[in-house]
């Protein structure tokens, strides 16, 4: 009896100690203020459910740090972002990405590797696809993306981008648009590698919560198919311009414009730029609209209520096109969101946004809810 009492007491103390440890860990991640340049780590649990996946569970993390803690050097925040989830129907999503700034910001490196075994809805190609044509497609995708840029003069970086990819697709209904659509090239998927130059102009005051300054990032990928897709050659051009204006101590106005184009004679559908994400054109399903060219712009007003809490409102427009863009076919989006700053020294936040898009005749208005780490741009 004494042994049982001692064992029960030991287990109770252990559980209490564990609970206190978890509470301290959560408090440190989300609520403690740290004015030093120490590293920090935060975790976001993932629990969702959908008919095509069943229950999905997982988590995302953000480890942030400085490669140089000497204040006078103004070295920017670096981070590592892991993401993993699995579903009860056997699908999975794994990725790790990093954004690294060397001491004094002389070099900037990024790297990302991901594997996705996950279904998505394919609506066809073009700027006027219909929800009724949605085709459920299973995708297996591997991607590796790398970049390296060196500071060559004040605020100007020059470097390269490189990477590899492989896509595989499986479509159950043989009569769906994914199989029957005449515009769809390489519907079985394919692999490839790429390399190309990049140029970045960046004078932002902060890379995690910018209050003033601008960044212009341009790159071109020279792409070559491999294995069964060995005959493919092409290119991909992208440019993004973002600028921030400090209206007062708590109010920031941000502008963001992106353009992407697939070049070359072929148009593998999985390489086509697509409209809609948690960062640009919030409110649209990613891939609802896709084509050889994509353009979009947005403006976001950010109000910092306190050190911890912020709110935003955003409005934008964008479209995809096979050739030239047209102002008359731009699709609108607007919405708002909440920010919680878990690391006030580094300006790191958790964001929750609700975006609203176009109302297509005969369909419900398009919309989306997003939770993520960091700012949208």
List the predicted regions and their residue ranges.
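C-terminal outer-membrane beta-barrel translocator/porin domains of Gram-negative envelope proteins
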Residues: 206-305, 311-314, 321
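Outer-membrane beta-barrel proteins
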Residues: 70, 118-124, 167-173, 206-208, ...
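Outer-membrane beta-barrel architecture
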Residues: 44, 60, 97-99, 147, ...
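Gram-negative/organellar outer-membrane beta-barrel architecture
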Residues: 33-41, 48-191, 275, 287-288, ...
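Outer-membrane beta-barrel "beta-signal"
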Residues: 196-197, 335-342, 365-377
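Short loop/turn motifs that connect adjacent beta-strands in outer-membrane beta-barrel proteins
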Residues: 22, 26-39, 67-77, 103-108, ...
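Transmembrane beta-strands of outer-membrane beta-barrel proteins
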Residues: 41-43, 78-82, 108-111, 158-160, ...
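Bacterial Sec-dependent N-terminal signal peptides
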Residues: 1-23
């Amino acid at each position: 009896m004494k042994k049982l009492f001692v064992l029960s007491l030991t287990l109770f103390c252990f559980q209490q100690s564990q609970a206190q440890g978890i509470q301290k860990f959560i408090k440190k991640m989300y609520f403690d203020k740290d004015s030093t340049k120490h590293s920090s780590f935060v975790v976001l649990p993932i629990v969702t459910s959908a008919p095509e996946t069943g229950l999905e569970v997982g988590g995302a993390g953000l480890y942030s740090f400085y490669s140089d803690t000497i204040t006078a050097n103004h070295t920017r925040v670096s981070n590592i972002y892991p993401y993993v989830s699995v579903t009860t129907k056997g699908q999975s999503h794994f990725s790790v990405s990093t954004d690294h700034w060397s001491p004094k910001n002389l070099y900037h490196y990024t790297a990302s590797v991901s594997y996705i075994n996950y279904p998505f809805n394919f609506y066809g190609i073009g700027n006027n696809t219909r929800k009724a044509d949605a085709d459920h497609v299973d995708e297996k995708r591997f991607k590796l993306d790398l970049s390296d840029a060196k500071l060559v003069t004040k605020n100007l970086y020059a470097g390269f981008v490189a990477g590899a990819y492989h896509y595989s697709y499986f479509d159950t209904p043989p009569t769906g648009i994914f199989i029957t659509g005449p515009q769809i090239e390489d519907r079985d998927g394919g692999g490839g590698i790429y390399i190309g130059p990049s140029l970045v102009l960046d004078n932002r005051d902060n890379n995690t919560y910018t209050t003033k300054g601008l960044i212009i990032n341009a790159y071109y990928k020279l792409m070559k198919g491999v294995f069964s897709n060995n005959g493919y050659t092409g290119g991909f051009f992208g440019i993004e311009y973002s600028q921030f204006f400090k209206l007062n101590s708590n109010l920031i106005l941000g502008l963001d414009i992106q353009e992407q184009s697939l070049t070359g004679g072929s148009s593998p559908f999985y390489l086509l730029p697509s409209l809609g994400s948690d960062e640009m054109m919030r409110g649209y399903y990613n891939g609802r609209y896709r084509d050889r060219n994509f353009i979009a712009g947005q403006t976001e007003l950010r109000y910092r209520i306190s050190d911890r809490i912020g709110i935003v409102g955003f409005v934008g427009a964008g479209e995809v096109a096979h050739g030239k863009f047209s102002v008359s076919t731009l699709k609108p989006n607007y919405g708002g969101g909440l920010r919680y700053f878990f690391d006030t020294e580094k300006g790191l936040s958790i964001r929750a946004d609700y975006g609203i898009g176009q109302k297509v005749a005969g369909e419900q208005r398009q919309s989306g809810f997003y939770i993520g780490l960091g700012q949208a741009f």
